[in-house]
Amino acid sequence: MLTNEAVLTVFADYLSRDTDFEVILTSRGYTVMGWDKYREDWNTVEYCPTPEALRDALLDAYTSFREMEVTDGERDLTAAEKSKIKSERDAFTEQCEKEVAICSS
């Protein structure tokens, strides 16, 4: 069974590099929040009621982070860049599945 802790472990390195997204533990559960540094305000807030929802929100945040990192927001991604980022996303998903297998053993 996937846990929030396992998801946070898998995404820990990414979260330490991305200063725009944070994971906050609220009284209702985890929430992923995206900061807009130009407007100086939160621009996305996604409540994650399950570990799977947390994983999916972090996959989306990671994709945005990598797209900005690669293009600097100045151009569209090339097909090769899209493919590379998709492979990186798939690797995160695979790591989460491995965490499930480890916890289930």
Regions found by a protein language model. Name each.
Residues 2, 39-54:
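A short, exposed loop/beta-hairpin motif centered on an aromatic-Gly-Thr core
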Residues 1-20, 58-85, 92-105:
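Negatively charged, low-complexity tracts enriched in Asp/Glu with abundant Ser/Thr
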Residues 15-43, 61:
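Short aromatic-glycine-(Arg/Gly/Cys) micro-motifs in beta-strand/loop hairpins
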Residues 37-45, 85-95:
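Short, charged low-complexity intrinsically disordered segments located at boundaries
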